[in-house]
Structure formats: C-alpha cells, structure tokens
Amino acid sequence: VERAKGILMQTQQLSDDDAFHILRTASMHTNQRLGQVSQHIVQSARFAEDVNRCGQLRMLSQRLVTLQVLQGVVQSGPFAQQLAESVQRIDANLVYLGKSLSQATYGELLGQVQQTWAGLQPGVRASAGAEAAVAAYARLDELAEHLLQGAERLTGQLESASPAPPLRVLNLAGRQRMLSQRFAKYAVLALMGDAPLQACSATGMAESRAAFEAALTYLNGLPLSAPDIHSALGAAGIGWLTLLAATKVAPGAGEAAQVNGLAEARERLIAVLEQLSAHYEHSMQMLTGA
C-alpha cells in the first residue's frame, strides 16, 4: 500500500491523504481489497516503465545514426555530446531492464538486444574518412536496424504480457519518438549525395511519415481525461509540421542551414514526444487500468 501511495504521490503530485483516498475509492469501485488495488498499481507502474525504456531503445537506435551523420556533415554543434548522451542512455536502459525483467521470460530477447548493441558500439565510436563515409553510414544504419528490430520484439512481448489495457496506447505513443527520429535520419542521409542512399531515404521518409501521422490521428481520437496529454498531442502535431517543413529546401539556403534546421526541428519534436510518453506512462488510466 505504501509503495502504491508513493507512486500516486510522485506521478500525480498528490498528498499522502489524497493518494490514500484514491486507493480506497478504487478498492470500493472494483470490489477488491486495498492490498490488491495497491499491487495492481505497483505492477502497472513497473510494466509501464519497462515498456517506456524498451521504447527508448527503439528511438535511440535511430537517433544514433542521425547524430553520427550530423557530426560528419557539421563539424561544430552539440551533436558529439548528444551522441555520447544517447550511448549512455542505451547502456543505462539495458542495465535497468536486465534487473527489472524476468530472465526466464525475457532473457533471450534482452540478450539479443544486448548482443546487437555490443556489435553496434564500435561503429558509433568510429569516425569514417570522407571516401568511406557513405558506406560507413550505411553499415551503421544496418546495425541500428537490427537494434530497432530487437527492441520492437522485446517491447511487443512486454505489451502482450501486461495486464494493463492502456499499455498499448503507451507503446504507440512511445513509438512516435522512434518514428520522428527515423524520419529525421532518412532526411539527413538523403543529404549525403549518394543516389542509392537517396532513393532508400525517400522510401524511408514516406513510410515513417505515414506511420507517424496515422498514430497521431489515432491518439488524437482517443477520449482524454488529462489536459497535459491533450496539450502535448497538440504540441507534437505542431512539432511534426515544423520537422516536415525543415526537409524542404528553401530557395538560396545552403546545405549547412538546412542541416541545422533539420537538427533543431528534430530536437524540439523529440522533447515534446518524450514528455507525451511520460504523461501517458504516469496517467491514472495507466496506473489503475481504468
């Protein structure tokens, strides 16, 4: 009961008395003992964090490639620091999931993700020469795709095993982070000037855009009880349109200006989407299953 109260107090900004009142009300409405309701909230919060962290791995797999390319195209800027922070986040999430997830149930899937990450890290740390740049980025993208697929499988397994119905919505909202970074990745790769890479990037941008916009439409159509979710969805829509506009070449604009515009729009959008995922993760619907 104390753990459940603590979760409600932290995520809903409630006092101790208000958190206990919510637990007691939920207990009466569901005809369950207070301990059962509390256990459900604790389990839901853990499942939600597991799914959110797996979802971050999906996003970070695409972010790594984008930042590596941006580092090569633009010599100055925050990209090296952002890349290092992304690597640290992947490491931290894998450590957390290794402790949180059941080894018997998820050990094989998590092990595959860890192995893929170990193979990807040398490519992230390497700096390719000018002639090998396109080939190196293509190889890095291929390895990042394996990391994405492994994280997708693990996230899907977690979603299907959870007793909380709203977890699908959390997973869908969290996946928007990956799709936005994936779209930006292809937009940046298209600037490399390699014809096959440009063709692949055009297809990737179209697919990512369609998936992102379909999910955003779905999320906007759900009944909302939290103003912060409604506000974040609106900001995500604006941020998405800004990112789309940044992919259009303005007359007279140089490559550096376009790259910087893409990078800034991408960063603003991911900040909004991270906030949106946090709102869903900590929502009362997520915690109580209502």
Where do the PLM segments sit?
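Hydrophobic alpha-helical segments
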Residues: 1-290
